[in-house]
Amino acid sequence: MKALLLPFFVLTSCSDPKPPVAEIPNYQTLHHEGLNGTFFHFDHEGDLYLACSIHQGGHAKGTTLNRHDSKDTASVGKQIHHQKDLRILTFTSDSIGQADALPYSPDPDVRKDDEVAILNRGEIIRGTVVRLPEGNDHHYYLQTSKTFPANGMSGSPVFSKRLGTVVGVLQTANSKTAANLGGFELLEMP
């Protein structure tokens, strides 16, 4: 009896969700000249999307975004989801994809005292969640030990160290030039 050897392949689908990561990543955000805000891309169940704050503008279909410190670009597609001050959009790009997308898990469980970080233009601004949404205020608040220039940072991703995923979108801060308190909206994909 002859043994038949068959090759065995393990294939990973492009639609596999990106798993959480152990360390807060260094991430280069996306920007559009003339807009005072930030976009980022993330993986949700194997599909890639852009997130931004509604109040910053620049989310018209066909708008070209540039990755900070790079020639990489993305073209804004259609809106697929929105929340109070948060928009989720499709996009196309030849150079921005799965490899550097931020991981996301549905229904993020953000808690008081969680270590989080604002990711913007390759910088990691570390903070701690100090307040959860109350009453009509839908924001979670993070406090940093060092001040940061918040002007133009609306739309930046807020990343949870404990969960290893992006959990929210920065929308407000207590100062444009020397903030130490930032408010973010939880990213809740349908």
Task: Tell me the role of every PLM-derived stretch.
Residues 46-126:
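Conserved active-site neighborhood of the chymotrypsin/trypsin-like protease fold
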